[in-house]
């Protein structure tokens, strides 16, 4: 982090550099997540689900223990569990992340199948004063929508959610800010007039 702090100081008269991290949220690491020292001059912490009770949906064997639909249900239940014990984050990242990895010909994912649970998740995020991320990597992977899908983004807005950040999960420079050009219209269609950035862990709202 010191490296980025030095960059921030060196270029402060030219560009704004914000320093952030992504924390994987899970009950088994909740103490570590909650004790992470945000006094290290971080601007932003994304909390995300990459594992489901310690198992990775990226791998095919993850899907062999139960039906695909039940597996997705377990994923969303794990998010609610994470929210009950992990508190040191600003937005929840790529909320329907698991949709990227559902095996072909196993289950045609429909978020409506989990509508009530997703609604509870979004209400909990809002009540905790957190936000969500709209992540364009879904488009990079050939999905028709970002993560989460726009219906979930709209539900979040309609429930009173205001904090929404934009991320690309680039991993490679060529995917930096991938398809950000279309995100503004997506957010407007979902009811938002602003997107959010964070400075010293405080949200700042930027008009679309």
Regions picked out by a protein language model, each given a short descriptive name:
Residues 3-13, 33-46, 83-87, 120-129, ...:
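Acidic (Asp/Glu)-rich catalytic clusters
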Residues 15, 44, 90, 164, ...:
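Secondary-structure boundary/capping signal
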Residues 19-25, 49, 93-95, 134-136, ...:
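A cross-domain feature marking catalytic cores of carbohydrate-active enzymes
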């Amino acid at each position: 982090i010191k490296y980025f702090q030095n960059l921030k100081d060196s270029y402060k008269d030219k560009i704004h550099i914000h320093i952030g991290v992504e924390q994987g949220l899970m009950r088994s690491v909740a103490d570590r997540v909650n004790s992470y020292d945000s006094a290290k001059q971080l601007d932003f912490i994304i909390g995300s689900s990459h594992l489901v009770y310690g198992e990775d949906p990226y791998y095919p064997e993850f899907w062999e223990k139960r039906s695909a639909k039940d597996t997705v249900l377990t994923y969303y239940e794990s998010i609610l569990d994470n929210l009950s014990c992990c508190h040191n984050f600003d937005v929840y990242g790529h909320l329907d992340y698991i949709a990227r990895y559902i095996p072909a010909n196993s289950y045609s994912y429909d978020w409506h199948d989990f509508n009530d649970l997703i609604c509870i998740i979004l209400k909990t995020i809002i009540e905790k004063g957190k936000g969500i991320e709209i992540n364009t990597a879904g488009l990079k992977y050939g999905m028709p929508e970002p993560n989460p899908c726009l219906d979930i983004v709209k539900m979040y807005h309609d429930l009173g959610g205001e904090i929404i950040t934009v991320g690309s999960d680039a991993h490679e420079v060529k995917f930096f800010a991938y398809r950000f050009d279309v995100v503004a219209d997506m957010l407007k269609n979902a009811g938002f007039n602003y997107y959010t950035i964070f400075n010293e862990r405080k949200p700042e709202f930027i008009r679309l």
